[in-house]
Amino acid sequence: MSAHAGFLLDSSVALGAFFEDEQNDYCVSVWRSLVDVPGFVPALWHLEMGNILSRALRAGRIGTDALDDCWARMAAIGLQVLPFHGDARHWTQRASDWGLSAYDACYLDTALQQRLPLATKDKQLADAARRVGIPIYLNSAESRR
């Protein structure tokens, strides 16, 4: 399946590494696997994580020390950023075809282009991935919710 050894990491799984109320066994297993298995993210991932973390900071869900810790932990795992392909029209069409947001369509399209399994907790994204033949990384009951 894979053009690269490894998997594509969705932000929904990464959140489980930073927020206890988002955590489950699937998130922990995926995060731990990054010690031995390369993790890839689409170019939008860091911006998406920045948006999530800045909203958490503004809402008082995390403090600045926790924010710094999140960024340090992300840097330490050495995620490899995959470049964008396509344009806004491409992402809009993919989103429409798959019934996803343009962001999630970016994840799925990147997984297809790179032939990578996808690590996600997002049921809608996981269902769309399965429909187009993309396996869910470390497939488990929790990754199917």
Language-model features: locations:
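Short beta-strand scaffold positions
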Residues: 9, 41, 102, 119-120
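Acidic, PIN/NYN-like endoribonuclease modules and their adjacent C-terminal/linker elements
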Residues: 1-6, 108-145
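Alpha-helix capping/helix-boundary segments
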Residues: 14, 45, 86-87, 107, ...
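Short, well-structured N-terminal submotif of metal-dependent ribonuclease cores
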Residues: 1-44, 56-68, 132, 143
